C-alpha cells in the first residue's frame, strides 16, 4: 500500500486506486489519557529490545508512571517518545545530559541540548512543563493532543521529521503488544 499522509492508502504508487483509510490508534491517542501499563511492562520492553543493561532508562520506568499520575499525561506515549528521541536511552545526550527527549537539541545546533540532574528530573520536567505548551489550546504550539503527523498533533511543531509521530506510535504499539495489549482501543 501507498500513502501520502499515513492514513489514506492506495494500491498503486501513483495513488490513483483508493484502498481505504486507517488511523493508527497510538498516533492519535490523546496524551491526556492514562495508560494501563505498569513500570514493569515498560522495563520489559526495554529488556526485550536489548537495552536492559546499557540504557539510562533502565530501572527508571517508575518515573513515567509517577509523572503520569501527577500530571495526567500518558506514561506509555511519553515512554515511547523517550525511546524514540534517545535511542532507547543510549544516545549521547541521554547518557551525558539525561536528556531523553531532545529538548533544545535543534537541528541547526544539537549541542545546545538541555541537561537534567537525572532521569526522574528529565521525565518530571518533560511531563510537567515542556509538554504543557503542546497540550494547552492557548499556546501557539498546540495543534492537537496526540503525537499525530504534520497535519495535526505535536508533530506539527515538535520535530522536523515528517514521520516522527508514526515512529513513536510504532514503539508504543510494540510496548503495549509485549504487555498483552492493555491499552489498545481502551
Task: Report each predicted region and the residues it spans.
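Pyridoxal 5′-phosphate
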Residues: 85
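Catalytic cores of secreted/periplasmic lytic hydrolases that degrade extracellular macromolecules
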Residues: 1-77, 88-186
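C-type cytochrome heme c attachment motif
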Residues: 80
Amino acid at each position: 500500500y501507498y500513502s501520502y499522509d499515513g492514513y489514506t492508502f492506495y494500491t498503486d504508487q501513483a495513488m490513483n486506486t483508493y484502498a481505504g483509510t486507517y488511523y493508527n490508534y497510538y498516533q492519535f491517542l490523546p496524551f491526556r489519557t492514562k495508560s494501563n501499563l505498569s513500570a514493569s511492562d515498560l522495563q520489559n520492553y526495554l529488556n526485550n529490545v536489548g537495552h536492559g543493561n546499557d540504557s539510562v532508562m533502565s530501572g527508571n520506568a517508575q518515573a513515567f508512571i509517577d509523572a503520569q499520575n501527577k500530571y495526567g499525561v500518558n506514561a506509555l506515549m511519553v515512554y515511547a517518545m523517550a525511546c524514540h528521541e534517545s535511542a532507547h536511552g543510549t544516545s549521547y545526550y541521554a547518557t551525558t545530559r539525561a536528556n531523553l527527549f531532545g529538548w533544545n537539541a535543534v537541528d541547526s545546533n544539537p549541542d545546545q541540548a538541555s541537561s537534567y540532574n537525572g532521569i526522574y528530573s528529565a521525565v518530571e520536567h518533560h511531563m510537567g512543563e515542556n509538554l504543557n505548551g503542546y497540550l494547552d489550546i492557548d499556546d501557539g504550539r498546540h495543534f492537537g493532543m496526540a503525537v499525530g503527523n504534520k497535519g495535526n498533533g505535536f508533530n506539527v511543531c515538535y520535530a522536523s521529521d515528517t514521520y516522527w509521530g508514526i515512529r513513536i506510535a510504532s514503539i508504543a504499539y510494540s510496548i503495549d503488544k509485549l504487555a498483552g495489549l492493555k491499552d489498545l482501543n481502551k
